[in-house]
């Protein structure tokens, strides 16, 4: 799922050695829309998200990120959820997010605590992440992706491990973020 200003793929390709994972893709993702990227397991969806977010370079072609609001350029333009988000298991969920926010100084502890409530983790925000279920880790990853109000959200399988309430919560959050 993608929520953004605009991302344009220009003949974007990604290879690992001789294996072409993504071949010369062109696409334009418009502002205020939610897109779903679907395909078989192993077809390169996660690789595409990593390239679009800047976590992985393309092999050829380019990815253009257009942000209309100059203020957006001053904050992290992209919030990302990639499968297997890395959190410090010895810290609580809240402490993980506060530590990440301390790096950029874009979110304060009060706002993060409110966000933990929004994603349904407030009863467990002081529990160490090592004791979080898969669904709780996914909620934490979503909170981390949106905590600095990014212009673009790239969410790779954001509903993995979520129960019905978690799915509903994520959909509600995406509706708000879209606007």
List each model region and its residues:
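The feature captures the beta-strand-to-loop junction immediately N-terminal to the Walker
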Residues: 38-40
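Helix-to-loop junction immediately C-terminal to a conserved catalytic motif
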Residues: 53
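Conserved ABC transporter NBD signature motif
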Residues: 61-74
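Conserved ABC ATPase "signature" region
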Residues: 98, 109-124
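Hydrophobic anchor residue at the start of the ABC signature
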Residues: 142
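Catalytic Walker B motif of ABC-type/P-loop ATPase nucleotide-binding domains
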Residues: 153-157
């Amino acid at each position: 799922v993608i929520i953004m200003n605009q991302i344009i793929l220009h003949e974007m390709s990604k290879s690992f050695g001789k294996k072409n994972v993504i071949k010369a893709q062109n696409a334009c993702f418009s502002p205020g829309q939610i897109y779903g990227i679907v395909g078989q397991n192993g077809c390169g969806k996660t690789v595409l998200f990593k390239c679009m977010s800047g976590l992985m370079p393309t092999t050829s072609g380019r990815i253009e990120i257009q942000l209309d609001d100059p203020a957006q350029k001053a904050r992290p333009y992209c919030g990302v959820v990639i499968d297997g988000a890395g959190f410090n298991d010895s810290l609580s969920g809240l402490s993980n997010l506060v530590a990440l926010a301390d790096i950029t100084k874009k979110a304060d502890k009060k706002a993060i605590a409110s966000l933990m409530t929004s994603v349904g983790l407030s009863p467990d925000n002081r529990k160490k992440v090592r004791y979080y279920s898969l669904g709780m880790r996914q909620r934490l990853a979503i909170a981390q992706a949106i905590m600095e109000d990014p212009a673009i959200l790239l969410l790779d399988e954001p509903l993995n491990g979520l129960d019905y309430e978690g799915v509903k919560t994520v959909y509600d959050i995406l509706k708000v973020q879209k606007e």
